Amino acid sequence: MKAAIFEEYGRPFHVTTMPRPSAGPSDVLVRIRASGTNPLDLKIHDGSAAHARQLPPTVLGLDMAGIVEAVGSDVTRFKVGEEVYGMVGGVGGLQGTLAEFAAVDPDLLALKPANLSFREAAVLPLVVITAWEGLVDRMQIKCGDKLLVQGGAGGVGTAVIQIARHFEADVFATGSKSSRDVIERAGATFIESSEAVVDYVGRLTGGHGFDKVFDTAGGAALDASFEAVRKFGHVASALGWGKHLLAPLSFKAASYSGVFTLMPLITGEGRRHHGRILLEVARMVEAGKLRPHLSGERFTLETAFDAYQAMAERRSRGKFVVDIG
């Protein structure tokens, strides 16, 4: 099969031929039709993600959508010819999705939403799993909650907004002036990120604070999240790194939880839950409650590194996809 590999951290990919994997007894062999890209892929590629190592030479790519080519003797949930999607590799020694085929743990898969193309489905797995784990598993979002999303225009941010709206939360999201349209189309009330926290908390919550806050940006945005949450509220972060003062949170008796979406890929624990999340998201998509946001640029395996460069340059608010097969 053809695959795009890189030999050294930070170096461009090159397309090579490598043995096609086979489905072991507990595997699903997927013919990959599209590979979605994520900012995390950039950090894995340049070796800067200490929490997400992938030693070169290797194939990158976390997300994909494709067609079941073969199933192992122990696999009962999928059949040859079914269209699937998932976050299945590209970290922890697992082959990535910039390849024509991958042997995949079926627990990481779900049937692709019937109303999406392979390209559209391939950009969803990481961002919707991250959003779901923070909103549903950690903060238990519910109807009527006032939710603040720190960084609402990115892939995770727009997924958080749409999933929270599905649960009938009242959603607000921060972003730059240029991101206002993306945030509002996703379904949130826009807050310009330059506005002081005390000002928008006063303006939108009467000074009480938000019931729940989902931080997608980390750094100063996480500190702002602690300031913006109400007493007994909850903050979840997908980028809760570095040093942060907990006093603003503690003095409100508010709680915090981190979201580490890669844990099941790296450790093997909790993979079935990822598949269940993707199944629920597929139902949302088919009901018209969630839509992916893609860039119009097209890439192939031969130009996959160009997709990574486009992502690094932030040439589009939509996600970039590599077409395969």
Positions of predicted regions on the chain:
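Glycine-rich cofactor phosphate-binding loops and adjacent beta1-alpha1 units
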Residues: 189-257
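Glycine-rich beta-strand-centered segment in the early N-terminal region that forms part
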Residues: 19-36, 48-90
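NAD(P)H dinucleotide-binding glycine-rich loop of Rossmann-like/cofactor-binding domains
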Residues: 77, 87-151
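Mid-domain Rossmann-like dinucleotide-binding core that forms the NAD(H)/NADP(H) cofactor-binding site
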Residues: 122-195
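Short glycine/proline-centered loop/turn elements that form peptide/ligand docking sites
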Residues: 72-74, 171-182, 219-222, 242-243
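C-terminal capping/lid region of NAD(P)-dependent oxidoreductase domains
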Residues: 282-294, 305-325
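C-terminal substrate-binding/catalytic core of Rossmann-like NAD(P)-dependent dehydrogenases/reductases
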Residues: 248-297
